[in-house]
Swiss-Prot record:
Family: Belongs to the UPF0346 family.
Name this protein carries in UniProt: UPF0346 protein M28_Spy0369
SUPFAM superfamilies listed in its UniProt record: YozE-like
Transmembrane segments: none
Signal peptide stretch: none
Any Pfam family hit: YozE_SAM_like
InterPro entries membership: UPF0346, YozE_SAM-like, YozE_SAM-like_sf
HAMAP family noted in UniProt: UPF0346
Gene3D superfamilies, sorted: YozE SAM-like
Length: 83
């Protein structure tokens, strides 16, 4: 089962980093209305565009999403190796 985007993003938190993923993770951490239990790109993208209490470059979000998907693929491959 795929980790929610929020769960994965929280593993990327690093207040000392200027990396876009770390910045987004810190912003989302402080946003109490962020959709935490989904991995639906459209829902999260619309939220960031229309409802988030902060602004973030959506082009960077697209890149972060691709990284999230890549990590999900790697995690899935690793779980198959356990069997």
């Amino acid at each position: 089962m795929r980790k929610s985007f929020y769960s994965w993003l929280m593993t990327q938190r690093n207040p000392k980093s200027n990396a876009p993923v770390a910045i987004l993770a810190d912003l989302v951490f402080d946003d109490t209305t962020f959709p935490k239990h989904t991995n639906d790109f459209e829902l999260i993208s619309r939220y960031l565009e229309d409802q988030a209490s902060f602004s973030f470059n959506l082009g960077q979000f697209d890149e972060i999403w691709e990284d999230y998907l890549a990590h999900q693929y790697v995690d899935k491959k690793e779980s198959y190796r356990l069997f």
